[in-house]
Amino acid sequence: MNRLLQRQLFLENLLVGVNSTFHQMQKHSINTCCRSLQRILDHLILLQTIHSPAFRLDRMQLRQMQTLACLWIHRRNHDLQATLDVINWISP
């Protein structure tokens, strides 16, 4: 297995773990604003990757940043400006 394939497999496994944790939390405590943030970021990721020859790995990395941003927002205050700041920060 070459190095790039190993890296991709590692990131896929990491992402599954991060998403699993996020969805377990979501069932119990993630507020509506966090779910809204998730939808906004899903849309941004789609816009950023639909017109470019993005590799699967690029999409996964964007998705991972999105999930971590949602967790970050949830742990902090549920504040619109903070949400917008995070969106600006993770958007290339």
Curated annotation (Swiss-Prot):
This is Non-structural protein 6. Interacts with NSP2 and NSP5. GO terms for cellular component: host cell mitochondrion. Keywords: Host cytoplasm, Host mitochondrion. Its main location: host cell. The keyword Lyase does not apply. Transmembrane segments: none annotated. It is found in: Host cytoplasm; Host mitochondrion. Signal peptide: none annotated. Belongs to the rotavirus A NSP6 family. InterPro entries: Rotavirus_NSP6. The keyword Cell wall biogenesis/degradation does not apply.
